[in-house]
């Protein structure tokens, strides 16, 4: 029986074989590698991956799809909301110090998923995700551009990222109303040591009114923390490089 895509799960199933082949080439799975796929759906990407890996763990929220996937002898199915999955525990269960994570992420919750995975980055080898193109543009954006923001800073602090493949709407069933792309995310081997929650709070305050000078937002936040160091608040949030935000968070710790 044909599965009807569910809007509440943000389901858009990949159906273009040429795009699927290109994604698999970008991921380059090798036999025996511990890999987790988020949102396998109708297994368009799952099947070519598991053929190369031998075994694959998948996270699927849709009960009907999870039931279908369980009939595949080479898949280990976690039926769950991805935001509730402890990826560190998944890695431990696989006996792997690091896991590779891939997926066609639901566009309606892609940013929360990225922040959730940030909490488990210590067990991540790399990540390849299909996302809304405009989200990837924000992820890889440079300072002094309109796309540069909280997502750019938080993810660039922890990952090296690149946009590896453009995916048009007609590659999906049903077609989304937006362009898509695939991003590769590789954790930095030695990221600057900083408390993630502190950096996130600092960056959120900075970008809360991005058109204003930082003295009106971050300046007041720093005053409240009785910060005595030096930081140029005569700039707008989008003009401050990632390294400066990280250094400020370190100074505030």
Curated annotation (Swiss-Prot):
Residues binding S-adenosyl-L-methionine: 12, 14, 39, 60, 81, 104
Q: What is its EC number?
A: 2.1.1.182
Q: Which UniProt keywords apply?
A: Cytoplasm, Methyltransferase, RNA-binding, rRNA processing, S-adenosyl-L-methionine, Transferase
Instruction: State the GO CC annotations.
Output: cytosol
Which reaction equation describes what this protein catalyses?
Answer: adenosine(1518)/adenosine(1519) in 16S rRNA + 4 S-adenosyl-L-methionine = N(6)-dimethyladenosine(1518)/N(6)-dimethyladenosine(1519) in 16S rRNA + 4 S-adenosyl-L-homocysteine + 4 H(+)
Q: Does the keyword S-adenosyl-L-methionine apply?
A: yes
Q: Which HAMAP family match?
A: 16SrRNA_methyltr_A (MF_00607)
Asked whether the UniProt record includes rRNA processing among its keywords, one would answer: yes
Look up the domain of life of the source.
Bacteria
* Predominant cellular place of this UniProt entry's protein: cytoplasm
Subcellular location per UniProt equals:
Cytoplasm
Which InterPro entries does the entry mention? KsgA/Erm (IPR001737), rRNA_Ade_diMease-like_C (IPR023165), rRNA_Ade_Mease_Trfase_CS (IPR020596), rRNA_Ade_methylase_Trfase_N (IPR020598), rRNA_adenine_dimethylase (IPR011530), SAM-dependent_MTases_sf (IPR029063)
Q: What's the protein here called? A: Ribosomal RNA small subunit methyltransferase A
The organism of origin for this protein = Paracidovorax citrulli (strain AAC00-1)
- PROSITE patterns assigned: RRNA_A_DIMETH (PS01131), SAM_RNA_A_N6_MT (PS51689)
Q: What is its biological role? A: Specifically dimethylates two adjacent adenosines (A1518 and A1519) in the loop of a conserved hairpin near the 3'-end of 16S rRNA in the 30S particle. May play a critical role in biogenesis of 30S subunits.
Q: Which family does it belong to?
A: Belongs to the class I-like SAM-binding methyltransferase superfamily. rRNA adenine N(6)-methyltransferase family. RsmA subfamily.
Q: Which GO terms describe its molecular function?
A: 16S rRNA (adenine(1518)-N(6)/adenine(1519)-N(6))-dimethyltransferase activity; RNA binding
